[in-house]
Amino acid sequence: EALMRPKDLTVTDLIAKYQGADKLHIIEVATFFGAMQAYFMRGYTERVAINSFPSDCIEPDEAQVFWEYFGDDIRGRMIIEILEYPYFSLDHWIEKNRSVRSMNNLFSLDDYGTGINDMEKVDFIKPDIVKLDRSMISEIDKDPEKQAKCKESIAILHDYGVKVVAEGVETKEEFDYLVSIGADYFQGYYLARPS
């Protein structure tokens, strides 16, 4: 996953600053171009997840430059991760969906289970992957309510043909429990720290 790491602000503060100035589009474009540039500079070949606002998309002229610059090298390598965000633009979503799917790339839905990204969004977006929010995962091995909710969510998502990522796995016990209930992929400090 390509993560934004601003130097003088938290990611949350940066987003708030740009949102307040109605300039989230700048972050969207910088994220796409910056993530793919870093991806190729580091010699990666596996898929890369890039965070994206559901309220924005790269404009057609920007997309043309993006596809011309990175071309077929990114076909099938990108996972566009739709962030939990209160604003959603149907027009931008239609364009983003068309553009991403035309290059055989995937969609994931981030922070599932927190309220905004829920089954309604799964029905609408039809993601290939859903990432269970860390709040569902933390200490799941000790919490019967979380276990029931997570197990049910994984079963329903699998019925939709969606792969499930457990985010924020920090202990062997969490990992082992999530394996036992069918999570497909895992992310968290137990497995690796960001580099």
Give the location of each predicted region:
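Structured helix-beta-strand junction loops
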Residues: 21, 44-45, 76-77, 103, ...
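A general structural detector for well-ordered alpha-helical segments in enzyme core domains, enriched
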Residues: 35, 62-69, 92-100, 118-121, ...
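Catalytic core of bacterial c-di-GMP phosphodiesterases, primarily the EAL and HD-GYP domains
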Residues: 25-95, 105, 168
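Flexible, glycine- and charge-enriched loops at secondary-structure boundaries
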Residues: 21-25, 143
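A short, polar/charged loop-to-alpha-helix boundary motif
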Residues: 4-18
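EAL-family c-di-GMP phosphodiesterase catalytic domain
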Residues: 5-8, 81-88, 106, 110-195
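Sensory/regulatory domains in signal-transduction proteins
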Residues: 1-6, 54-58
